[in-house]
Curated annotation (Swiss-Prot):
Residues 1-26 form the signal peptide. The cysteine framework is XI (C-C-CC-CC-C-C). Disulfide bonds join 29-43, 36-48, 42-51, 47-55. The keyword Lyase does not apply. The keyword Cell membrane does not apply. GO terms for molecular function: potassium channel regulator activity; toxin activity. It comes from Conus vexillum (Flag cone). This is Kappa-conotoxin-like 2. It comes from the Eukaryota. It is found in: Secreted. Belongs to the conotoxin I2 superfamily. Expressed by the venom duct.
Length: 67
């Protein structure tokens, strides 16, 4: 009976650790100057191909407005 209780406890502990690692790994973010996407967000600031405080307007023939 003691062996079964220990095995179940270890199994539950492993599941809890895996859930914790999943939360830590999926909630990562990137500092300024690093490439970003909507799926790989910036820690602070906004994503304009790279993490920045402010997006600048691009001038020229193919100017685009970025929020």
């Amino acid at each position: 009976m003691m062996f079964r209780l220990t095995s179940v406890s270890c199994f539950l502990l492993v599941i809890a650790c895996l859930n914790l690692f999943q939360v830590v790994l999926t909630s990562r973010c990137f500092p300024p100057g690093i490439y970003c996407t909507p799926y790989l967000p910036c820690c602070w600031g906004i994503c304009c191909d790279t993490c920045r405080n402010v997006c600048h307007l691009r001038f020229g023939k193919r100017a685009t407005f970025q929020e």
